[in-house]
Amino acid sequence: MKLDRILPFAKLLLEKAVQPGDITVDGTMGNGFDTVFLAGLTGEKGHVYSFDIQEDAIQITAAKLKAESMHERCTLVHDGHEQMNKYISKEHFGNITGAIFNLGYLPGGDKSIVTQANTTISAIEQLFEMMAPEGIIILVIYHGHPEGATERDALLHYVQDLPQQKAHVLKYDFINQSNNPPFIVAIEKR
């Protein structure tokens, strides 16, 4: 297939937005793959803030970062992404160039612990104010479970109402695939 699948396309967008030395956010740490990816993009002089409410996610991600010698450029936060204002250094406000949220539940974890539209929207609103112009927020929306469908609907309603003078919003999905495949919403600050 020549078209980029969902996760490679998300990474491509982040690679365009993030430069060495930049500040980034992983809003849903999960198994740490995005945190490690962002730490690679930001390099030794950059920084990644990564959030999750599950202790397992913190431990898994910390081990991956240590194995890659990237742990010193990351702040792992054991709290919800809706609390990011409390953790992101004020000196980084206006300097965040990329962020990603993989919404749903932790793969291999407790499927009853899922992201919620209200906390995700709160995080997006906070993050948008901290973003640099042309910074990109990526939402990877997994909606094949009831809570995911509810979150999808609320997020699509929210992003469709963002003023075009403030943001460009892209939806990237495969419309002829069955079983509710994930899709991307990308928000670029103008």
Language-model features, listed with the residues they occupy:
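Mobile active-site "lid"/loop adjacent to the S-adenosyl-L-methionine
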Residues: F101-S122
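S-adenosyl-L-methionine
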Residues: M1-I23, G27, F33-V36, G40, I58-N95
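Helix-to-beta-strand junctions that scaffold the AdoMet/dcAdoMet cofactor pocket
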Residues: Q19, T42-G43, M131-P133
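Conserved SAM-binding motif I beta-strand of class I
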Residues: H47-D52
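A short glycine-rich, Lys/Arg-flanked "PGG" loop and its adjoining helix->strand segment in the class I
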Residues: T119-P133
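Conserved beta-strand signature within the Rossmann-like core of class I S-adenosyl-L-methionine
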Residues: T28, M130-I141
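Class I S-adenosyl-L-methionine
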Residues: A149-R190
